[in-house]
């Protein structure tokens, strides 16, 4: 096993522990708490994949961080902070919409890279909107927290989320997953639109009809046999 993979996991475990202690003192905001919950699932998945105990990794990560801090000068710290692009949190969904449980009558699931796509294929002839909470850097989607598909009545009928065991994804991963979800929902004569906010940050533009500018290859894929995709 690559030593960098192990040490990266150890550092991530300790940093999560620090953030959790901070949150336990009720000092974290909503995006901060969302990241803690998301990263906890990711660390559990990586622990299983790597075969490394999280508690032992956390202790090892603490030693690595302490060594780095002992060697770090204040000036170097200032320069590193200045070089990191500032990201912000964009919310289409309310906390209630993000945390609400939902159920599928005819569940379908697809894994597209590090993202999991779920949808209810029992939904017919509905107007559906895709809304998401995500982080943005340089005015482009950086990390998807959660995407959900809502009918005009407010029911949840689809979802895109990260796989805990495969952390990290690109904006292209997100756009491909959205295309698969739209194709699956439209297969049953539903009308699907993407929120203007999500269009703007994922594609850099927005259409009034809610249809993002998918590439021709993606359009052909969406028009194909959905059952093989979802």
Swiss-Prot record:
Report the GO terms under cellular component: host cell cytoplasm; host cell nucleus
Q: What is its main location?
A: host cell
- Kindly give the InterPro entries that the UniProt entry links to this protein: NS1, NS1A, NS1A_effect_dom-like_sf, uS15_NS1_RNA-bd_sf
Q: Give the region (RNA-binding and homodimerization) as residue ranges.
A: 1-73
Q: Where is this region: PABPN1-binding?
A: 223-230
How does the record describe its quaternary structure?
Homodimer. Interacts with host TRIM25 (via coiled coil); this interaction specifically inhibits TRIM25 multimerization and TRIM25-mediated RIGI CARD ubiquitination. Interacts with human EIF2AK2/PKR, CPSF4, IVNS1ABP and PABPN1.
What does the sequence similarity comment in the record state about its family? Belongs to the influenza A viruses NS1 family.
State the function annotated in the UniProt record. Answer: Inhibits post-transcriptional processing of cellular pre-mRNA, by binding and inhibiting two cellular proteins that are required for the 3'-end processing of cellular pre-mRNAs: the 30 kDa cleavage and polyadenylation specificity factor/CPSF4 and the poly(A)-binding protein 2/PABPN1. In turn, unprocessed 3' end pre-mRNAs accumulate in the host nucleus and are no longer exported to the cytoplasm. Cellular protein synthesis is thereby shut off very early after virus infection.
The name on file for this protein is Non-structural protein 1
Ranked from the top, the taxonomy reads: Viruses, Riboviria, Orthornavirae, Negarnaviricota, Polyploviricotina
Q: Which gene encodes it?
A: NS
């Amino acid at each position: 096993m690559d030593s960098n993979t192990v040490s990266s996991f150890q550092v991530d475990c300790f940093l999560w522990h620090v953030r959790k202690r901070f949150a336990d003192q009720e000092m974290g905001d909503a995006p901060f708490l969302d990241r803690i919950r998301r990263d906890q699932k990711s660390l559990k998945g990586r622990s299983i994949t790597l075969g490394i105990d999280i508690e032992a990794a956390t202790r090892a990560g603490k030693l690595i961080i302490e060594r780095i801090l002992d060697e770090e000068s204040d000036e170097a710290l200032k320069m590193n902070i200045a070089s990191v692009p500032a990201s912000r949190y964009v919310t289409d969904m309310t906390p209630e919409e993000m945390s609400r449980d939902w159920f599928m009558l005819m569940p379908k699931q697809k894994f597209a890279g590090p993202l999991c796509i779920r949808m209810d294929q029992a939904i017919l002839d509905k107007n559906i909107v895709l809304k998401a909470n995500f982080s943005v850097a340089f005015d482009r989607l950086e990390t998807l927290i959660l995407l959900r598909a809502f009918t005009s009545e407010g029911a949840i009928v689809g979802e895109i989320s990260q796989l805990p065991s495969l952390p990290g994804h690109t904006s292209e991963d997100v756009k491909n997953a959205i295309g698969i979800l739209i194709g699956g929902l439209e297969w049953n004569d539903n009308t699907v639109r993407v929120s203007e906010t999500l269009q703007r940050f994922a594609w850099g533009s927005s259409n009034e009809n809610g249809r993002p500018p998918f590439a021709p290859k993606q359009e052909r894929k969406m028009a194909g046999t959905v059952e093989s995709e979802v």
